[in-house]
Amino acid sequence: MERKQRRTLVGRVVSDKMDKTITVVVETKRNHPVYGKRINYSKKYKAHDENNIAKAGDIVRIMETRPLSATKRFRLVEVVEEAVII
């Protein structure tokens, strides 16, 4: 039996204070069903970061996985773009 394609999302790391866990905010745009105006939606996901490589401000790709804790359902795949430190 073949496994389904897992969902991948790209977002920005907003917190890396927990050990082996990052909080990623994923922003999407959708049209309002009646008025047609573009509306920004954002949702936060907790993701598993085994080696603590992602830092706050990084753009990362996360992938859906089995439940790793009460709130973690995603894991870090790669750091797409590192944050610029000023």
UniProtKB/Swiss-Prot annotation:
Ligase among keywords: no
Alphabetically ordered keywords of this record: Ribonucleoprotein, Ribosomal protein, RNA-binding, rRNA-binding
Transmembrane regions: none
Top-level division of the source organism's lineage: Bacteria
PROSITE patterns tied to this protein: RIBOSOMAL_S17 (PS00056)
Family matches, as InterPro entries: NA-bd_OB-fold, Ribosomal_uS17, Ribosomal_uS17_bact/chlr, Ribosomal_uS17_CS
GO molecular function per UniProt: rRNA binding; structural constituent of ribosome
An example Gene Ontology biological process: translation
Gene3D superfamilies, per the entry: Nucleic acid-binding proteins
GO cellular component: cytosolic small ribosomal subunit
NCBIfam families named among the record's database cross-references: PRK05610.1, uS17_bact
Subunit description: Part of the 30S ribosomal subunit.
Task performed by this protein: One of the primary rRNA binding proteins, it binds specifically to the 5'-end of 16S ribosomal RNA.
Family affiliation: Belongs to the universal ribosomal protein uS17 family.
Protein name per UniProt: Small ribosomal subunit protein uS17
Organism: Streptococcus mutans serotype c (strain ATCC 700610 / UA159)
